[in-house]
Regions:
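Short, well-ordered loop/turn sites that connect or cap secondary structure elements
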Residues: 119-120, 139
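Beta-rich strand-turn-strand
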Residues: 110-113
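Glycine- and Gly-Pro-enriched alpha-helical subdomains that act as flexible
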Residues: 123-127, 131-133
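Short, intrinsically disordered, mixed-charge
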Residues: 106, 121-122
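Ferredoxin-like alpha/beta domains used as RNA- or RNAP-binding modules
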Residues: 1-107, 134-208
Length: 208
C-alpha cells in the first residue's frame, strides 16, 4: 500500500490549520503552525489568492490529511456517501468519523491517528471482543472498542489514555480508563467534527 513519508508538519502549514498529525506536539508551543504561520517553501510568506477551484481543492486536501486518507480511499468514501440519502457532505464526514482508527484516536488509545492505525494493523485493538486489523472498519452504536486481550496491548493503551484523561468525549462515545475501553452510544453528528472544513465545497469539487 502506498504511504506518505516526509515531514508532516508541512501539511498542516500548507492547509493553515492544525491537523494534529504529530500527536501531543501539536498542542505545545513547538507546533510548526504556531511558530511559522505561513505555507512551506520558498517565498511562502506570499500566500496568494486562490481561485474557486483552488479553494475547493484545499478543502478536499485538508479533509484527506486530517483523516490520513489516500486519494483512492477518499473517493471510495465519497462514492458511498453519495449513494446514501440526505446531505452528501455531512454523510461523508460521518463516515470518516466512524472509522476505527479515528474512534481509537478520540478515545485516546494513541497520541495520533497514524499511531492508532499502526496499533490496529498490528492487532492491538478489538471490537466486541474480536480482533480487528482494518483501520477503515466502521463502528456502529453498541460497539465496544478496547485493547485486544493481552497485557501488552492493555498496558500500551492505558498509558496513552491516562495522558489524555482530561479530553472531552463527544456525545456519541463513552470511555473508561480502568479498564481501558470505549463504547459507541450513538452516531456522530456534524457538530462533533472539530476540523473547520466546508464540506459543500468538497462535494462541488468531487462532483465535477
Amino acid at each position: 500500500m502506498a504511504r506518505r513519508i516526509g515531514p508532516v508538519c508541512r501539511l498542516c502549514r500548507r492547509e493553515g490549520v492544525k491537523l494534529f498529525l504529530k500527536g501531543s506536539r501539536c498542542e505545545t508551543a513547538k507546533c510548526s503552525v504556531s511558530r511559522r504561520e505561513y505555507p512551506p517553501g520558498m517565498h511562502s510568506w506570499k500566500r496568494g489568492k486562490f481561485s474557486e477551484y483552488g479553494i475547493q481543492l484545499r478543502e478536499k486536501q485538508k479533509l484527506k490529511r486530517f483523516y490520513g486518507l489516500l486519494e483512492k480511499q477518499f473517493r471510495l468514501n465519497f462514492a458511498e456517501a453519495e449513494r446514501g440519502k440526505g446531505n452528501t457532505g455531512e454523510a461523508l464526514l460521518v463516515l470518516l468519523e466512524r472509522r476505527l482508527d479515528n474512534v481509537c484516536y478520540i478515545l485516546g488509545f494513541a497520541p495520533s491517528r497514524v499511531t492508532c492505525r499502526q496499533f490496529i494493523t498490528h492487532g492491538h485493538v478489538s471490537v466486541n471482543g474480536r480482533r480487528v486489523t482494518i483501520p477503515s472498519y466502521l463502528v456502529k452504536p453498541g460497539d465496544a472498542v478496547e485493547p485486544y486481550n493481552s497485557d501488552k496491548s492493555k498496558k500500551l493503551v492505558k498509558g496513552f489514555m491516562e495522558q489524555s484523561a482530561e479530553r472531552r468525549m463527544p456525545a456519541w462515545l463513552e470511555r473508561s480508563i480502568e479498564p481501558p475501553k470505549g463504547t459507541v452510544v450513538g452516531m456522530p453528528a456534524r457538530d462533533n467534527i472539530s476540523l473547520p472544513v466546508q464540506e459543500q465545497l468538497i462535494v462541488e469539487f468531487c462532483s465535477k
